[in-house]
UniProtKB/Swiss-Prot annotation:
It catalyses: a (3R)-hydroxyacyl-[ACP] = a (2E)-enoyl-[ACP] + H2O; (3R)-hydroxydecanoyl-[ACP] = (2E)-decenoyl-[ACP] + H2O; (2E)-decenoyl-[ACP] = (3Z)-decenoyl-[ACP]. Disulfide bonds: none annotated. Homodimer. Keywords: Cytoplasm, Fatty acid biosynthesis, Fatty acid metabolism, Isomerase, Lipid biosynthesis, Lipid metabolism, Lyase. Pathway: Lipid metabolism; fatty acid biosynthesis. This is 3-hydroxydecanoyl-[acyl-carrier-protein] dehydratase. The keyword Lyase applies. The active site is at residue 70. InterPro entries: FabA (IPR010083), FabA_FabZ (IPR013114), HotDog_dom_sf (IPR029069). It is found in: Cytoplasm. Necessary for the introduction of cis unsaturation into fatty acids. Catalyzes the dehydration of (3R)-3-hydroxydecanoyl-ACP to E-(2)-decenoyl-ACP and then its isomerization to Z-(3)-decenoyl-ACP. Can catalyze the dehydratase reaction for beta-hydroxyacyl-ACPs with saturated chain lengths up to 16:0, being most active on intermediate chain length.
Length: 171
């Protein structure tokens, strides 16, 4: 089977429903927690570590759900949502590789916020660079990531970790 190297919003939402890779595969969150509109490129051997990479985008609109509640009179995208998008994309990479299980964020080494996403912004871009993949009893990916708003880097994270688990009852 040939793997796709880009995904539109409908395909990403199909992943949330278990229709893209099957019901045993990891799923992306559904709206409103899906934090990107498209994956523009995903590769098994790309990125600076040569272990894989994902590139994705989110169109910014003033009517996005989080601007109405965070904060009233001072709308800004919560930083944790950008960080969660990085975990979502790292987990999607594992599922795209064909690993089974439910995705869970396992932590990160370092996170830096040096800017913000305001309603007047146009585009958020994510760059995820996979640094390690373990595919044994434990299925896990580790990545370094950056988030840009209108081509300005505003978030970075090192050593993001996501695992896929076939049983989550004791997690």
């Amino acid at each position: 089977m040939t793997r796709l190297h880009a995904f539109n919003r409908e395909q990403l939402l199909a992943s949330a429903r278990g229709e893209l890779f099957g019901t045993a595969a990891g799923r992306l969150p559904n709206d409103p927690m899906l934090m990107f509109d498209r994956i523009t490129d995903i590769r098994e051997d790309g990125g600076p570590h040569g272990k894989g990479m994902v590139r994705a985008e989110l169109d910014i609109r003033p009517d996005l759900w989080f601007f109405g509640c965070h904060f009233i009179g001072d709308p800004v995208m919560p930083g944790c949502l950008g960080l969660d998008a990085m975990w979502q994309l790292t987990g999607f990479f594992l599922t795209w590789l064909g690993a089974p299980g439910k995705g869970r964020a396992l932590g990160c080494g370092e996170v830096k916020f040096t800017g913000q996403v305001l309603p007047e912004a146009k585009l958020v871009r994510y760059e995820i660079d996979i640094s390690r993949v373990i595919n044994r009893k434990l299925v896990m990916a580790q990545s370094d990531a950056r988030m840009y708003v209108d081509d300005r880097e505003i978030y970075s994270a090192r050593d993001l970790r996501v695992g896929l688990f076939t049983e989550t009852g004791s997690f």
